[in-house]
Amino acid sequence: MRDPVDYFHNSLVPMVVEQSSRGERAFDIYSRLLRERIIFLTGPVEDQGASLIVAQLLFLEAENPKKEISFYINSPGGVVTSGLSIYDTMQFIRCPVTTLCVGQAASMGSLLLAAGEAGHRFALPNARIMVHQPSGGFQGQATDILIHAREIEALKKRLNEIYVKHTGRDYETIHQALERDNFMTADAAKEFGLIDDILHKRPEPAAA
């Protein structure tokens, strides 16, 4: 069965045609927006998509290490290590990264939303944000199962520490909040410290 996410990206992405002195050039819409320093996380967080986002972040830093990057997130979450590769790159590069939730930012999506530049983490009014502890499954010998259980516990502790860093909440508050699926409105996410503000309308550009 065809992956619906792959089908969307390969078949339904619109093309943008631009005129220049050299003639016409066609871009897919995401490549065109990348020129404006806009990156998207759409769908599950997984290795291939995470590698593309990391590459885009590094490319934009190489182009201009001081200019802001806008990171739009609409994701149900996914693989923790894939999400952490994006998170670490966001913290590593010199560019400030503005995050904006459109639709949903759940699980690793919410962590990446919170990881944006302080004061520049946003959500649209009807966005939904969800936080929870990591989950996983493993089959094998009893000793190996225990090893994987310890690894999940270590990841849980590390993720809690990251949420503490970016929300300003104490560890126990984060631990309790992430014990079960915890769904939030944009207002609740702002109160919790995952975002800084809710955007209802794009601000008018400053007068020249």
UniProtKB/Swiss-Prot annotation:
The keyword Hydrolase applies. GO terms for molecular function: ATP-dependent peptidase activity; ATPase binding; serine-type endopeptidase activity. Pfam families: CLP_protease. GO terms for cellular component: cytoplasm; endopeptidase Clp complex. Its EC number is 3.4.21.92. It is found in: Cytoplasm. The active site is at residues 107, 132. One of its GO terms (biological process) is protein quality control for misfolded or incompletely synthesized proteins. InterPro entries: ClpP, ClpP/crotonase-like_dom_sf, ClpP/TepA, ClpP_His_AS, ClpP_Ser_AS. Cleaves peptides in various proteins in a process that requires ATP hydrolysis. Has a chymotrypsin-like activity. Plays a major role in the degradation of misfolded proteins. This is ATP-dependent Clp protease proteolytic subunit. It comes from Methylorubrum populi (strain ATCC BAA-705 / NCIMB 13946 / BJ001). The gene is clpP.
